[in-house]
């Protein structure tokens, strides 16, 4: 059999026909699996069904609840704006936009250092620390009385929240196989799209308080902060670092989880060493930058949900109480659409790009109608604003999951996520500024930017990514068996603290499991890209 050249990053060692990978560069679950794997039998279909049910009831519920609170916190400023916040702090439409911009300045700045810390530190403990800081900042928001104070708090809130979603997505990747994760992503993000439902009802209740001793927006913020505090305690006590140490699964179940994930993805579960070679590869891989460009363009529309309550009131005939109920109805519609998207992805394979394009269409149509309808058609404009402002979150969800799952190698995954979310942060720095007070009440320039860039050009980029990855898959599938055997023949793990020394290491063979070596998708030509 002719050998295919196996290219591995600089952290590995090539000796004649062998590639030796130091054990410190292997999957962090390796030691756990070496101790327990042999004693655990293969999972039966009935056991796998029970395991999947338990995973969704525990891990999935856990990360979805955190995600819900994250977006409830993000929405506080939007609801505070109709609860007397502007009057107490002296904000105007333009300074409100600046506050939103500064939140995403912090969000963008936090991406690369935050993702680096997420790799180096225990994931669960790091998340607990972020949530504790986030809770403190939410409560401190009640002390803000001017523009400077609001800006400072929102900047640090953006900095703190910047890597929470990547941590949640990484956690999903550790516990669910590739098909489950792809199908569950819209359902997972239904939590964020549905956040206006509980938030809107809380605001609706607060608006009914008569003769309050403190401002209504402060009462609202304290309630949201209290919920976040409870979640912080739960995360610190029970959120897992990885499948090897999750407290509410048996050792046998942990082994099954690791086997399933590694078998379906062909990549490692977690890696605590930051690999410069994988970082460089991620930055050179043009797929990384295509995803970054998608998020830069698509997220120019992301200020629309935060503008909704102000748009509703600016139309006239919709008061503060009415705008909260309209937001709740719009969020309910978005959640239903997210469930439908989940069913689509579960039923049909390799349709990520097409599904994202399909769910961009309501936002495109809604934006065109909101900009074009006569101003006296209040009901029509209101309905189309709701349609435009809620549904475009689904393509974002699909793309964020796809950006991660289409990369292999732990450092490369984190680097690509950082680039994607940094681009999202830049877009959200720009986004509030397209809603200029002088363009009110119709804001036609903002609608045009969203129609052309966010809802037309951005989905076309996902289609381009689909065709590029499909071409790579076709090339790999031609020689799949030969490539797989070649890798298994040549790559071995060496137990050594000194990665530059072969002699002092002990070679350990891991047959038929390339996942433990933490190879990237370009290093491992048996990696098949999800589409």
Curated annotation (Swiss-Prot):
First-listed, main subcellular location of the protein, grouped into a coarse class: membrane
Lumenal side: 76-97, 142-154, 208-218, 307-324, 374-378, 437-447
Protein purpose: High affinity cysteine-specific transporter. Major contributor to cysteine transport when cysteine, at low concentrations, is provided as the sole sulfur source.
Mode of membrane association: Multi-pass membrane protein
Ranges per topology, Cytoplasmic: 1-54, 119-120, 176-186, 240-285, 346-352, 400-413, 469-531
Subcellular location, record wording: Cell membrane; Endoplasmic reticulum membrane
GO BP of this protein: cysteine transport
Stretches that traverse the bilayer: 55-75, 98-118, 121-141, 155-175, 187-207, 219-239, 286-306, 325-345, 353-373, 379-399, 414-436, 448-468
InterPro entries: MFS (IPR011701), MFS_trans_sf (IPR036259)
Pfam family, one: MFS_1
GO MF assignments: cysteine transmembrane transporter activity
Induction text: Induced under nitrogen starvation conditions, co-regulated by GCN4 and GLN3. Regulated by the MET4-based sulfur regulatory network. Expression is maximum in nonrepressing sulfur conditions and considerably repressed in the presence of organic sulfur. Induced by chromate.
Protein name as it appears in the record: High affinity cysteine transporter
Residues carrying a glycan: 146
Keyword vocabulary terms for this entry: Amino-acid transport, Cell membrane, Coiled coil, Endoplasmic reticulum, Glycoprotein, Membrane, Phosphoprotein, Transmembrane, Transmembrane helix, Transport
């Amino acid at each position: 059999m002719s050998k295919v050249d196996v290219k591995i990053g600089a952290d590995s060692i090539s000796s004649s026909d062998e590639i030796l990978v130091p054990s410190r560069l292997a999957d962090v679950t390796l030691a756990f699996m070496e101790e327990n794997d042999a004693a655990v039998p293969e999972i039966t279909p009935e056991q796998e069904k029970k395991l999947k049910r338990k995973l969704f009831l525990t891990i999935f519920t856990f990360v979805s609840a955190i995600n819900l609170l994250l977006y409830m916190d993000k929405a506080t400023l939007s609801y505070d704006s109709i609860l007397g916040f502007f009057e107490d702090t002296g904000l105007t439409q333009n300074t409100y936009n600046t506050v939103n911009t500064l939140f995403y300045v912090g969000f963008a700045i936090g991406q690369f250092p935050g993702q680096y810390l997420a790799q180096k530190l225990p994931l669960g403990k790091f998340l607990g620390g972020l949530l504790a800081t986030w809770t403190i900042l939410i409560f401190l928001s009640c002390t803000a009385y001017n523009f400077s104070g609001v800006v400072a708090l929102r900047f640090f809130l953006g900095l703190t929240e910047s890597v929470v979603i990547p941590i949640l997505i990484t956690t999903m990747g550790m516990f669910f196989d590739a098909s489950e994760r792809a199908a569950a992503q819209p359902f997972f993000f239904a939590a964020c799209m549905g956040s206006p439902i509980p938030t809107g009802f809380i605001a609706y209740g607060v608006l009914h308080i008569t003769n309050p001793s403190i401002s209504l927006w402060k009462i609202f913020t304290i309630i949201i902060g209290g919920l976040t505090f409870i979640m912080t305690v739960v995360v610190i006590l029970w959120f897992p670092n990885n499948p090897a140490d999750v407290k509410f699964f048996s050792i046998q179940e942990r082994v099954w989880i690791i086997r399933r994930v590694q078998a379906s993805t062909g990549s490692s579960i977690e890696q605590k060493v930051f690999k410069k070679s994988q970082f460089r590869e991620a930055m050179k891989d043009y797929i990384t930058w295509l995803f970054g460009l998608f998020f830069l363009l698509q997220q120019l529309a992301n200020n629309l949900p935060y503008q909704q309550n102000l748009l509703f009131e600016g139309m006239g005939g919709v008061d503060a109480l009415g705008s909260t109920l309209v937001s709740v109805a719009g969020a309910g519609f978005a959640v239903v659409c997210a469930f439908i998207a989940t069913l689509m992805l579960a039923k049909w394979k390799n349709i990520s790009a097409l599904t994202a394009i399909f769910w961009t269409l309501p936002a495109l149509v809604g934006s065109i109608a909101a900009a074009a309808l006569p101003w006296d058609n209040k009901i029509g404009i209101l309905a189309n604003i709701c349609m435009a402002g809620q549904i475009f979150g689904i393509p974002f969800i699909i793309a964020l999951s796809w950006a991660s799952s289409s990369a292999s190698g732990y450092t490369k995954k984190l680097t690509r996520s950082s680039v994607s979310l940094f681009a999202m942060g830049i877009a959200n720095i720009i986004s509030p500024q397209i809603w200029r007070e002088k363009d009110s009440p119709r804001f036609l320039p903002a609608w045009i930017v969203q129609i052309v860039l966010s809802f037309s050009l951005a989905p076309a980029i996902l289609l381009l990514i689909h065709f590029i990855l499909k071409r790579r898959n076709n090339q790999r599938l031609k020689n799949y068996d030969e490539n797989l055997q070649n890798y298994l023949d040549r790559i071995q793990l060496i137990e050594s603290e000194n990665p530059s020394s072969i002699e002092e290491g002990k070679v350990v063979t891991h047959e038929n499991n390339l996942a433990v070596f933490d190879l990237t998708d370009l290093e491992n030509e048996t990696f098949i890209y999800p589409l």
